[in-house]
């Protein structure tokens, strides 16, 4: 059994359902400390975060490459639907099954073993290796990576490169990396009306009828055209609720929850202003609360993307694709202190599902890609 596979299994065996780390990070610290990493644990509201650093011979003047990831996993769902226990690593048909196998304990194991091999081969490496690991990526993400980034900002520390181990591969291992992510902003809209008997509409004010034209305009609006890296911004309704459940009562208010996934072609302020302008144009009386869960970030082609593309090509023979599709990730926080943030990891087809798994044959190549990037950028 390879060292990467063994460590992956050790991590899967720890039932680290968010935000409980289940001492996964303690296991990582033992391995990293043996390599000479300095480390600190940053705890916040039940969340465990790890920042570990091994300086190269160039000291603080050298380039810093960070590996970022999360030890927490999503809940298992109904246990009876799993073919094998989710926290008992199980091999079947060339696959390793277990919650977190693909998202993202294999990536973390790959980070660690790649660093071990790199340090053994390059004991006098010039640049710095760092690890940023959290147990709050699958949850609210309010006490995890963002807290470490804030602490680093206060100390004036920065990263030059960061690889986030998210499972980005789509159809084949290595076929896709993420060099950016769209921003996410949600709105909770309450349109006010006047409740009344449905037989006497002249004595009431139906908020659903008032809302409908504005809603149609919001749905039809083209928010931007996207750009070279991002598709156009999207606006989607997630929930609509109104009424008491009775068939003879005009409701007093209508509630709508919606979400923007927006590119670097738009801004938070600009999108909010346009929504308010449409609602105001239709003469609505309303309350609107906004929640921005992440700003868009983008890493243009550069040293990190080139090194990762070459590493993937050398390891798999594939020409990888740069993409910004998908949901948000902790890369949105890291981008505040790092100009080059790229996500790369295993196939994502089974993540968050019953019987999550990773192809055993992909585990060593994953580690090798990470090691090849270290060799190119900080040896």
Swiss-Prot record:
Active site (UniProt): 72, 137
InterPro entries named in the record: ArgE/DapE_CS, Bact_exopeptidase_dim_dom, DapE_proteobac, Peptidase_M20, Peptidase_M20_dimer, Peptidase_M20A
Metabolic or biological pathway, per its Swiss-Prot or TrEMBL entry: Amino-acid biosynthesis; L-lysine biosynthesis via DAP pathway; LL-2,6-diaminopimelate from (S)-tetrahydrodipicolinate (succinylase route): step 3/3
Enzyme class of the recorded protein, top EC level: hydrolase
Cofactor note text: Binds 2 Zn(2+) or Co(2+) ions per subunit.
Molecular functions per Gene Ontology: acetylornithine deacetylase activity; cobalt ion binding; succinyl-diaminopimelate desuccinylase activity; zinc ion binding
Domain of life: Bacteria
GO biological process, one term: diaminopimelate biosynthetic process
Keywords recorded for this protein, A-Z: Amino-acid biosynthesis, Cobalt, Diaminopimelate biosynthesis, Hydrolase, Lysine biosynthesis, Metal-binding, Zinc
Alphabetized PROSITE patterns for the sequence: ARGE_DAPE_CPG2_1, ARGE_DAPE_CPG2_2
Catalytic reactions of this protein: N-succinyl-(2S,6S)-2,6-diaminopimelate + H2O = (2S,6S)-2,6-diaminopimelate + succinate
Ranges in coiled-coil conformation: none
Family: Belongs to the peptidase M20A family. DapE subfamily.
Subunit structure, interactors included: Homodimer.
Name of this chain's protein: Succinyl-diaminopimelate desuccinylase
Species this protein is from: Paraburkholderia phytofirmans (strain DSM 17436 / LMG 22146 / PsJN) (Burkholderia phytofirmans)
